[in-house]
C-alpha cells in the first residue's frame, strides 16, 4: 500500500508491503528518467531489516516512459525481473539471517526469483489481463506466439556459448 514518506525526488513513490497486520518491508519506486539518475534498471538495498526491530527498505529504479506513454514488452520484462529482486529482498530481509539471504545470496540463486517472475509476461492468460495498446485492445495471441518464437530463436547457440565459458 502507499507509504506517506519523503523521498529524494517528487516522482519517487513509497510503498509498504504487509502480510495482514505484519509489516514485511518498505520500498521506493523510482520509475522515470531524469538528469543525473542511474541509467539502468536495478534494485538497491537502502537498509537491511532487523527481526522485530526494523523493516527492510529498498528502491527499484527504472527509466520508463512518463504519463500516457505505453511501455514496450521488453520494459515490462525488465520491470518484473527487477520487481522479483525487490520482493526477494523484502521477504528475506527481516530475519536473523538477512545478511546472507534475499539478494545477498549465492550468485547461482540470486536471479532465480526474478527470472521466474519475468516469465509471466510470456504467458498469454497473464499478459492479456494488462497488456493493451493505445486503443485498449489486448495483445493478439498470435503476436505473442511470434514474439516467443523470436525470443527462442538461436537459444541453443547462447546455451552453447555459456557451456564453453564454463569449461
Model regions and ranges:
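Cation-handling catalytic/transport regions enriched in His/Asp/Glu
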Residues: 1-166
Amino acid at each position: 500500500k502507499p507509504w506517506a514518506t519523503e523521498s529524494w525526488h517528487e516522482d519517487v513513490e513509497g510503498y509498504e508491503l504487509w502480510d495482514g497486520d505484519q509489516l514485511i518491508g518498505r520500498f521506493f519506486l523510482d520509475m522515470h528518467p531524469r538528469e543525473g539518475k542511474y541509467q539502468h534498471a536495478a534494485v538497491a538495498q537502502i537498509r537491511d531489516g532487523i527481526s522485530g526491530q526494523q523493516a527492510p527498505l529498498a528502491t527499484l529504479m527504472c527509466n520508463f516512459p512518463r504519463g500516457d506513454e505505453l511501455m514496450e514488452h521488453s520494459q515490462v520484462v525488465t520491470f518484473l525481473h527487477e520487481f522479483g529482486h525487490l520482493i526477494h529482498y523484502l521477504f528475506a530481509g527481516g530475519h536473523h539471517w538477512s545478511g546472507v539471504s534475499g539478494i545477498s545470496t549465492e550468485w547461482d540463486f540470486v536471479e532465480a526469483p526474478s527470472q521466474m517472475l519475468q516469465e509471466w509476461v510470456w504467458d498469454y492468460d497473464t499478459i492479456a489481463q494488462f497488456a493493451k495498446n493505445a486503443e485498449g485492445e489486448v495483445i493478439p495471441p498470435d503476436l505473442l506466439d511470434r514474439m516467443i518464437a523470436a525470443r527462442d530463436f538461436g537459444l541453443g547457440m547462447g546455451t552453447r556459448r555459456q557451456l564453453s565459458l564454463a569449461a
